[in-house]
Design a protein with these regions (language model features):
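Conserved N-terminal beta1-alpha1 strand-loop-helix module at the mouth
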Residues: 1-87, 91-95, 102, 110, ...
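Generic enzyme active-site microenvironment
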Residues: 32, 172-173
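Short, electropositive alpha-helical surface patch
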Residues: 83-91, 186-195
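Short, acidic/turn-prone active-site loops that include or flank metal/cofactor-
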Residues: 91-93, 115-117, 138-142, 197-200
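Residue microenvironments linked to proteolytic maturation
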Residues: 106
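Short acidic capping loops at alpha-helix termini that bridge into adjacent secondary structure
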Residues: 168-170
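Glycine-rich beta-strand-to-loop/alpha-helix junction loops that act as flexible
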Residues: 173-176, 194-198
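Acidic, divalent-metal-coordinating active-site segment for phosphoryl/phosphodiester hydrolysis
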Residues: 176-188
Length: 217
């Protein structure tokens, strides 16, 4: 089943309880939470204390994406905060294999991702242990960017390798996803779609979600 993972980066944080209720009522199962440290990417966003507070408000699957240096330092604390999926960057982690196992050992699904300029096949050695592979289709750090077209071939490659090798990872895409391109992205192999401004860009959250789902289901 194809699913959306609305990005909290585009939500109205002062009204987050109501917006979480709205997305769940519209059939959403996942919530994408971007964590940025101001070093790996320019922006600084939320951390473990805020995620812990969100956990009290929602039983959605927390799809947490760490855009931080040396993410292995914080794996246990994000598990304690309530993350269900923890995705880390190849570029930010020296011992990627060990870190992915550490995520699993802390009871979370282990996700791995790369920046748009990094070749997708560089992840070949960790695909057997990954629960999720996230294709960044914009440069990480800011919402509202345009989709990078060469991301389509990365999705196709991941789909082909998974089928050939009988791997089990979920293929996720993040960046520039909207109603005009989500069908093409879905056909390339994506199954989980991070959508920020396409969901939270106005007060019609349910209508936005319905419009996206109609393109992929």
């Amino acid at each position: 089943m194809k699913e959306l993972s609305p990005s909290i980066l585009s939500a109205e944080l002062s009204n987050i309880k109501q917006q979480l209720e709205q997305v769940k009522a519209a059939g959403i199962k996942y919530l994408h939470i971007d964590v940025m440290d101001g070093l790996f990417v320019p922006n600084i966003t939320i951390g473990q204390p805020y995620i812990k507070s969100l956990r009290k408000l929602s039983d959605l699957i927390f799809d947490v994406h760490l855009m931080i240096e040396k993410p292995e330092r914080y794996i246990e604390s994000f598990a304690e905060a309530g993350a269900d999926i923890l995705t880390i960057h190849y570029e930010a982690c020296t011992h990627l294999d060990r870190a992915l196992h550490q995520i699993k050992d802390n009871g979370m699904k282990a996700g791995v991702t790369i920046n748009p300029s990094t070749p997708i096949n560089i992840l070949s050695e960790v695909l057997p242990i990954a629960d999720l592979v996230l294709v960044m289709s914009v440069n990480p750090g800011f919402g509202g960017q345009s989709f990078i077209e060469n991301s389509v071939s990365k999705l196709e490659w991941l789909k082909e390798v998974r089928q050939k090798e009988n791997y089990n990872y979920i293929i996720e895409v993040d960046g520039g996803v909207k109603t005009s391109n989500i069908e093409k992205i879905s056909n390339a192999g994506a199954e989980l779609f991070v959508a920020g401004s396409a969901v939270f860009n106005d007060k019609y959250i349910k209508e936005n979600i319905d419009g996206l789902y109609k393109k992929i289901r």
